[in-house]
Amino acid sequence: PETAVWGFDGQVPGPEIRVRQGDTLRVELRNGLPEPTTIHWHGLRVPHAMDGVPHLTQPPVPPGGSFTYAFRCEDAGTFWYHPHANSPEQLGRGLSGALIVEEPEGAAPPVDRDVTWLLSDFR
């Protein structure tokens, strides 16, 4: 049977976000869902107001509403983003994506290829 999915920017998984360590990440969430949502930046040290935990660090973004996340990416690494509002349903429908914070130019060892795999199970 078909699975109804929800996607960030119309895709599942959401688009890979790639920034350099020390850069400011700015993302505007425009909620096209039939319910409130947020974005939580899993594993990143972010200001409290940017953490995406509804009713704790921010009000949930209502259907048709928007919220701009903006914060400096202090730590290099591989992270992911996902909602913290009605997480079982929203994650289960595909709302997640990869966030890569790269080290400064020349700091990382050279590699032949850099590939991101983000797996999810809808059933």
Show which residues each predicted segment covers:
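Histidine-centered copper-binding motifs that mark active-site loops
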Residues: 1-123
